[in-house]
Amino acid sequence: MSIQVYILIQTEVGKSSSVTKSVTAIAGVTIAESVTGPYDVIMRAEAASMEDLGKSVLAKVQAIPGITRTLTCPVTSL
C-alpha cells in the first residue's frame, strides 16, 4: 500500500504555469494542475512510505523557484 498526498501550492504572481510544469516532472507526482482560489497549484503524489515521500517528492517540490508556501494533505481511508 502506498502513501498518497495532495499538496496545495501557493506561488509568486505569474509563476503558477512554470511551477506546474516543474512539479509534473518529479517522479512520484501523479497529477498537477493550476487552479484558482487561495492556492495556485494542486498536485497529487504517491510513494512507498512517508520517508520516501519526503525524500523523493516533498524536498524537490519545496526547492522549485516561485513557490511561496505549501500545504500537504495525506489521503486517508475512513
Tell me the role of every PLM-derived stretch.
Residues 1-78:
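A compositional/biophysical signature of low hydrophobicity enriched in polar/charged and small residues
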